[in-house]
Amino acid sequence: MSVDNYFKYLNPQNRVLLEEYKKSTQNQMWVTTIILSLTIIDNILSDENNLDYIDGLDINHFINSKDFHWLRLRRNQILHYEGPKEGFFESKDSDNVLKIDSLRADKILKKCFSEFFK
C-alpha cells in the first residue's frame, strides 16, 4: 500500500516530512530516507492525538520489534559518528549497502503505518 493512503492520519509536520521522504526515495537519497523514516515514526509515537485511534498494544508491539530497534540503531550510526560504518567507505558497494538499508527502512515505515492506522 502506498504511504499516500496514510497522509490523512498525520499531523501537519509529519505530512511535510512524508513529502520530503517520498522525494528522497525517488531521488535515491538513501541516507535521507533512513533518517526521515525514523523521524516520521518518532513523530507518530509522540503525537498525543494519535492515541484516539492507535491501540496501545500495537504501539508496544511495534516499539519492541527487532525492525524498530534496527532502524533506530542504523539511524544513530549515520548521525553520530563513532568511527567508520558500513555504507560510508566511498566504494561502489557502499551505495548498495545504503540502498538495501533504505529499502528496509521503507518497509519498516510502511509496517508502522499499516499496524497503527488500520
Predicted segments, located by residue:
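Non-transmembrane, amphipathic alpha-helical segments
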Residues: 6, 25-29, 60-63, 94-97, ...
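A short, mixed-charge helix-start or loop-turn motif at secondary-structure junctions
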Residues: 2-4, 57, 91
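Amphipathic, well-ordered alpha-helical segments in soluble domains
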Residues: 13-17, 36, 74
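Charged alpha-helical initiation segments
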Residues: 1-29
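Short, charged amphipathic alpha-helical segments flanked by flexible coils
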Residues: 46-77
